[in-house]
């Protein structure tokens, strides 16, 4: 099934100037990057985006990390994009991530683990709408 999913290249990727390499992993998997933009999240935006984790011990460090520098937010499209991108990302903990995955090859630790990807269709829709307006998504077809 053709799906869309949200990808975030986290501040460690931008800071280390490896966004191009990460994008190669995405594109080599067969996924298309249909829109992307770089932005600097405010604390409010980061807290709102990750509010599902608010009660977790890692919430504050996660928010501080996500606002520490620019991120690249992307919409990826392809067959079974959500599950495929989760495979391409690798396990959340890079120590458990397979070689050949983004986290297995690039992540420094569980906190600076390079990427975020939607984990369900429902979350993909919500997360894409969080970062991209209907106009931005519609304009993809109006060039």
UniProtKB/Swiss-Prot annotation:
Alphabetized GO MF terms: ATP binding; metal ion binding; nucleoside diphosphate kinase activity
Cofactor(s) needed by this chain: Mg(2+)
Active site: 116 (pros-phosphohistidine intermediate)
Catalytic activity: a 2'-deoxyribonucleoside 5'-diphosphate + ATP = a 2'-deoxyribonucleoside 5'-triphosphate + ADP; a ribonucleoside 5'-diphosphate + ATP = a ribonucleoside 5'-triphosphate + ADP
Main location: cytoplasm
PROSITE patterns: NDPK, NDPK_LIKE
SUPFAM superfamilies on file: Nucleoside diphosphate kinase, NDK
EC number per UniProt: 2.7.4.6
Subcellular location field: Cytoplasm
Keyword annotations from UniProtKB, A to Z: ATP-binding, Cytoplasm, Kinase, Magnesium, Metal-binding, Nucleotide metabolism, Nucleotide-binding, Phosphoprotein, Transferase
Positions of ATP binding: 10, 58, 86, 92, 103, 113
Subunit structure: Homotetramer.
Function: Major role in the synthesis of nucleoside triphosphates other than ATP. The ATP gamma phosphate is transferred to the NDP beta phosphate via a ping-pong mechanism, using a phosphorylated active-site intermediate.
Family membership noted in the UniProt record: Belongs to the NDK family.
Protein name, entry field: Nucleoside diphosphate kinase
């Amino acid at each position: 099934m053709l799906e869309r999913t949200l990808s975030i290249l986290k501040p460690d990727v931008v800071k280390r100037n490896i966004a191009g390499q990460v994008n190669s992993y995405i594109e080599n998997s067969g996924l298309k990057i249909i829109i992307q933009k770089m932005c600097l999240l405010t604390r409010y935006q980061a807290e709102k985006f990750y509010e599902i984790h608010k009660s977790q011990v890692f919430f504050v460090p996660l928010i501080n990390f996500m606002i520490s520098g620019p991120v690249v937010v992307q919409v990826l499209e392809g067959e079974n994009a959500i599950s495929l991108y989760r495979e391409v990302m690798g396990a959340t903990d890079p120590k458990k991530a397979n070689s050949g995955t983004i986290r297995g090859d690039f992540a420094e630790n569980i906190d600076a683990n390079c990427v975020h990807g939607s984990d369900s269709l429902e979350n993909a829709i919500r997360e894409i709408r969080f970062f991209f307006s209907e106009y931005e998504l519609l304009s993809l077809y109006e060039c």
